[in-house]
Amino acid sequence: MKLRREALVFFSAISLLKDIKASSSDSLVTDYSSRYQHSKGTTMSVKCSDTPQFLALQTAAEQMKMDEKLHLKHLCSDAARCAGLVANHETEGGRKIILDYSRQQVTGEIMELLFDMADKVGLVDKRNDMRCGKKINSTEGRAVLHHVLRMPKGYDYSVRNPAEGKKILDEVHAVRDKIEAFVSKVRSGEHKGVTGKELKNFVCIGIGGSQLGPEFVLEALRADAKASQAAMGRQLRFLANVDPVDFNVCTRDLDPAETLVVVISKTFTTAETMLNARTAKKWLIDGLADQGIVDADDIVKKHVIAVSTAEDLVTEFGIDKNNMFGFWEWVGGRFSVCSAVGIVPLSLQYSYEVMSEFLDGAHCIDEHFFEAPLRENLPVLLGLIGVWNSTFMCYGTRALLPYSQALKRFPAHIQQVDMESNGKRVTIDGVPLPFQSGEVDFGEPGTNGQHSFYQLMHQGRVVPADFIGFMESQTPVELQGEIVSNHDELMSNFFAQPDALAYGKSLSDLIQEGVPENLREHKVFMGNRPSSSMLMTKLDAFGIGQLLAIYEHRTAVQGFIWSINSFDQWGVELGKVLAKQVRSQLNTSRKSQASVQGFNSSTSALLEAYLSHKK
């Protein structure tokens, strides 16, 4: 009786879907013609929570949670359903990306509701606004154009952006040409250090998007045949944390005579970055003084370069303005890996040629995202599923599980891309959201994660997961006498884990297997844990660019659906302000033994304890 009643609830949601499709748009939801122009010029649409699809999806989600017949073990037994929940993207040369989301807790009808909701909130128009350079980052009055960084020379961007398209793309390629020329001089030995030694060590100083994205790409290419060959004899390291331990570990075995420091800061005022830059400057000057070089100005000019927009502060630091590589206000930090922020240090390590292939891969997905129909669009599908899991199924976390050790820093980068973008409390026009946006992202490469946090995923909280695997290994190994290659062993787990999460193992299964009664409940796997599987051909520079762009655009899609601004980050400001107050107190107390003033009792007590400590 209960199941029948629950089924009626579910089918009422599907009935509502049919009613929505049959009814005129102006009778159920604000028509497209009612969309208005935001004061900054971006197109706004109705909020997702104001659409009838939102209500229908809430109803469907409640039923999905309650109805045993909608358990994934039953949904996945429907071959037709599973075949309909797969998307394929193929590029020249036979490269494939297969996205299988049949193990998500969705049906064809639920996906139709999601597509219809996307239509009502103007997803396509918002996507086009981004493509054409409208100022969709309205709180900062900026366009969002990281996709332009990947456009090849000769691309006719003026078709999309008649007013500024050609100028913007010309500027992008002027910087890229400058990077290529400088990198060629360093890698060929034409640009040497002050002692005449070639510069083979690269210390990249930056934090947040200036570090996480480039570091992900560095690690992803480390075992690639072409990239590793190009990197022979060179090493790139990232210095982000202001903790002096990070600086010590980064530089302790480097020769300053062979080291080039890359300082990355848009404003050249980022507190942590500039303190590390000054520390590196002193390290270079002191280290080279020990080798008989005393011209500090010449040391800085030959051993320090900058990625910044603040030429006056860069030159004041002592850096040759010809060794400054710019970018633009329309490049957000977490989306900047394809700008000089990432391309300068990564080209020094792997060559400009390899990084051009990376940019080509990202551009390939940009074109797919902007052109492909929504139902075949990989970032759109991932974004809609993310909205379903977060907003309707109320799952607050997402695991990123790349079955490739090369992607060990990928989850950390996407953690910033997604959480800094979509962790917002109000819509783009300042209205509090009626639900929580964003997800808590975390992950580790498989199979390492299986021996760490998968226990919770299988028998604890429900955590939607993205499995990412590759048909080819960067370093194939096949040992004589083993039944499978090392890569096949890895991929065996890639294919098995989503099924284990979806199907689980029941009490009756355990009884049939003869498991002792006292252990049966401990060994039950409830299953019904959602995941998507993305299988790509190979992880080279092009493939890494594809993967990056898929997840960047996935994040934007979710923000578009939620009607939030995914491209600002006001949430990072308050802590900076408070840290400035603490910094001032520490300075005063260290110099004059002044007592702690102006803080709450808890912080005051901790500060007093910190200041009173004697080594």
Predicted segments, located by residue:
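Gly/Ser/Thr-rich loops at beta-strand to alpha-helix junctions
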Residues: 78-82, 203-214, 266-274, 311-313, ...
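Extended, charge-enriched "interface" segments that sit outside catalytic cores
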Residues: 49-195, 558, 594-598
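Acidic, Ser/Thr-rich peripheral helices and adjacent loops at domain boundaries
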Residues: 478-513
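Active-site phosphate/pyrophosphate-binding segments
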Residues: 276, 283-479, 484, 504, ...
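Short, Lys/Arg-enriched N-terminal segments with co-localized hydrophobic residues
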Residues: 31-43
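N-terminal small/polar loop signature for handling phosphorylated ligands or for N-terminal nucleophile
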Residues: 170-192, 197, 242-257, 264, ...
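Anionic-ligand anchoring segments at beta-strand to alpha-helix junctions in alpha/beta enzyme folds, i.e.
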Residues: 197-257, 279, 401, 405-441
